[in-house]
UniProtKB/Swiss-Prot annotation:
HAMAP family tied to this protein: dUTPase_arch
Record's function text: This enzyme is involved in nucleotide metabolism: it produces dUMP, the immediate precursor of thymidine nucleotides and it decreases the intracellular concentration of dUTP so that uracil cannot be incorporated into DNA.
Keyword field: Hydrolase, Nucleotide metabolism
Listed name of the protein: Probable deoxyuridine 5'-triphosphate nucleotidohydrolase
Organism per entry: Methanosarcina acetivorans (strain ATCC 35395 / DSM 2834 / JCM 12185 / C2A)
Classification via CDD domains: trimeric_dUTPase
Gene it is expressed from: dut
Highest taxon above the source species: Archaea
Biological process terms in GO annotation: dUMP biosynthetic process; dUTP biosynthetic process
SUPFAM superfamilies, alphabetized: dUTPase-like
Amino acid sequence: MTLLSSNELRKLIQATPHLLENAVDIETQIQPNGLELTLKEIKTIEGVGAVDFDNSERKVPDAKPLEFEDDDWIHLPKGIYKVIFNEIVNIPMNLAAIAKPRSSLIRCGATLETAVWDAGYRGRSESMLVVYNSAGFRLKKNARIMQLLFYTLNSEVEEGYSGVYQNENTK
């Protein structure tokens, strides 16, 4: 497993399908070892969720969109939120990705909770934003909040991601 550099990421962004679509400013979002994703939407999580072994009883709680102010800022009190990214990611069958919050979030008392991004996944993903700071946290629409680190797999997978979140938020 090898972490991809910005040079390799640039090639994949230009390939078909593009590794990343709908970037706000791709030159700013390409970092030495990853791609930054930007904030499209924020929602509150409403209700109870449930996870079981075979997903037959899985329930993702409803979410209520929050509105940005006229200046595109939003103040978030301490708590948890769902964030949706602007970018659509297309992960090739020989790559996987791990997402990390930008260090600026952590320095402000907030972080992101994410999962592994599997080979073959395509979509505009969601993550959980946790605001720990008792004074809250301000975010601007299109802020760069997460960095995706892409790793080459030892061999291409035979079958890529095919779960319920495939192509999420792309319609």
